Amino acid sequence: MKKRVLAVILGAVMTMSLAACGSSDAGKTSSDDGEKSYTIGISQFAEHGSLDNCREGFLEGLKEEGIEEGKNLTVEVKNAAADQGTAKQISDGFVSDKVDLVCAIATPSAQAAYNSAMNSDIPVVYTAVTDPVAAKLAKEDGTPAGNV
């Protein structure tokens, strides 16, 4: 039940994030039926059951909101193999590719994505971050920092 609620929340956040970028057509293509298509970059810090569940729950939440891989969504999943330098390279690549959104899984990937996307209009969502304030992903009052 907890995972399902998390997936729905993440899906709603994703939908709102994509809607906020709706005026820009960069990186978007049309699917066969004329519906907009999106590309999401998922940066996962390491292979781990809990982190895998976060990724799967995120994608399930999107599907429940009508954003489905193979239909109107392209997903690029990359794993940093527990290396912060690799996490930074992954995030830089997503920004360079102008994905529509970056989903970062675990604190080091979230920090890398935040720093890479800081001067872009690419929204960043994250999961599996224990303390967003300490990670400098949120302000002291809990509001997001930048485009996170």
Please identify what each model-predicted range represents.
Residues 1-13:
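Positively charged n-region of N-terminal signal peptides that target proteins for export
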Residues 16-20:
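C-terminal motif of bacterial Sec signal peptides marking the signal peptidase cleavage site
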